[in-house]
């Protein structure tokens, strides 16, 4: 089975994940993978690996996030 690299955005609260999900269709909400630590049990996964673009988007949209990591999923 081939694994695909994805970007995981983590959050401190479920409200922040829902906030991002309502502002973009470029990914989806998933449970935090076991290899990632996060304050909230849910995260946002995207196949768009451009971390800088995501950081800029999150800042522009006033979405609070904890971390952005790459994971083979």
Predicted regions, residues:
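Positively charged, small/polar-rich N-terminal and surface patches that mediate targeting and assembly
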Residues: 1-73
């Amino acid at each position: 089975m081939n694994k695909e690299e994805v970007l995981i955005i983590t959050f401190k609260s479920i409200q922040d994940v829902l906030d991002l999900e309502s502002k973009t269709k470029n990914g989806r909400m998933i449970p935090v993978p076991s290899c990632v630590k996060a304050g909230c049990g849910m995260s946002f996964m995207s196949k768009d690996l451009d971390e800088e673009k995501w950081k800029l988007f999150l800042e522009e949209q006033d979405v609070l996030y904890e971390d952005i990591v790459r994971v083979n999923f």
